[in-house]
A protein has these predicted regions:
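Outer-membrane beta-barrel translocator/pore domains, especially the C-terminal barrels
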Residues: 1-311, 315-394
Length: 394
């Protein structure tokens, strides 16, 4: 339960929204660990101030476009509460992006509420058609300034180690002060370790019981200089030029002068039945991938679909998808083959597994077989399912 008192003051060119709330959570655990409470509770207040301005000006040779400049700031305060006795069912720490930048709780899920004393600032500019409202450009840059070091953590990476999975962490940004260690769930502030965060030696990548593996918790005395801010996050979206669009997400650490994350995707989407995607993803110490996909008619009744994901870091194919679709006046049939990399204990790979999905759909009746449309909509950005009569399926 989270009752909240909010005041929304909006007008032409500005908004001002302060909020005060109170989180109250109680668990009713049927199989609690001996010695642990079966009905643990947590209660804590929080405050938030969200404010911004919107400036507009005419753009284009005839003033047919409008450009905006939109500064925004969100101050969040959540006091620290020890939540170690609370279970974790569905809580995780998401990647830092512009959506997460302005959230009060840095965790997804209610099992952990992160303490916060921070100010998120962002600046957005948009360019759109004055008459139709069609957007041509959107660009945003933002950063979080921390006034205190976050203390609430989650043990997800320790659980991965105990399960024999690889360490899901980043190398330390200061290897001279912390030689040979890997810090888990590093994100706030920046990629700098902070007290209460778990760490592991490199041998732990072979398993928690491997010789030389040491797992511990960072104490305040082990931390030197703290980063006062997060990475700088930026997003650029270009649309409206001859069915082409470009999306760029970039995350930069100003203290190490390194790129922590980068995503680029180009899409060609001339109509609802044709789409081609070209993408590149990079995340420091985690992944470096190419991702291409398409859906395209190859005849009056035939359509083809495909996707290929290749890891530059591992020099191997992560996923392959190939399929076809045949449509007539009375029925539609789809066959999709998927090959994907299977990982085993310890992070090793066991080659590519193969699965095949078959779906038959009759006009006016339900489909038979696995829902290939749902799968393709998740795998191919811009893919649109169509029935045998060539009508779009919502």
């Amino acid at each position: 339960m989270s009752p909240e008192l909010r005041w929304s003051n909006r007008g032409p060119g500005y908004f001002f929204e302060p909020a005060l709330g109170y989180h109250v959570t109680q668990y009713d655990l049927k199989n609690a660990v001996m010695g642990e409470p079966s009905t643990p509770t947590r209660s804590l207040p929080y405050g938030r101030l969200d404010a911004g301005l919107v400036f507009e000006r005419a753009a284009g040779s005839a003033g047919q476009r409008t450009q905006t400049l939109e500064p925004r700031m969100v101050y969040s305060y959540v006091p620290y509460r020890n939540q170690d006795e609370l279970p974790i069912f569905d809580t995780a720490l998401p990647d830092l992006n512009l959506t997460e930048l302005f959230r009060t709780n840095r965790y997804v899920g209610d099992d952990r509420i992160g303490d916060a004393n921070q100010l998120a600032v962002g600046l957005t500019t948009r360019l759109f058609d004055h008459v139709s409202g069609a957007q041509y450009l959107s660009a945003t840059i933002g950063q979080i300034r921390y006034f205190s070091i976050p203390r609430v953590t989650i043990p997800e990476d320790i659980l991965r180690l105990e399960s024999g999975l690889p360490v899901a962490g980043l190398p330390l940004v200061n290897p001279l002060a912390w030689p040979g260690l890997f810090v888990t769930n590093a994100r706030a502030p920046g990629s700098q370790p902070f007290p209460g965060q778990t760490y592991a030696t490199p041998n732990c990548q072979l398993g928690a019981n491997a010789p030389g593996c040491q797992i511990g918790v960072i104490t305040p005395g082990q931390i030197g200089v703290q980063y006062p801010a997060s990475d700088i996050v930026s997003e650029i979206s270009l649309t409206g030029y001859k069915h082409l669009s470009l999306d760029l997400n970039y995350q930069w650490n100003p203290y190490t002068s390194h790129t922590d994350k980068e995503e680029i995707e180009v899409q060609y989407h001339p109509d609802s039945s044709r789409v081609v995607n070209l993408g590149y993803r990079f995340q420091e110490g985690i992944l470096k991938q190419y991702d291409t996909s398409f859906a395209w008619p190859i005849g009056g009744h035939w359509n083809a679909v495909g996707r290929w994901v290749y890891s530059l870091a591992d020099r191997t194919t992560i996923e392959q998808i190939a399929g076809f679709e045949y449509k007539s006046c009375c029925y539609r049939i789809q066959v999709v083959q998927r090959r994907y990399l299977r990982r085993i204990s310890g992070g090793a790979t066991a080659g590519l597994d193969t699965s095949i999905a078959l779906q038959l759909e009759l006009t006016g009746l339900s489909s038979v077989g696995k829902p290939a449309d749902t799968f393709l909509q998740k795998e191919i950005r811009g893919y649109t399912a169509r029935d045998p009569a060539n009508r779009e399926i919502p």
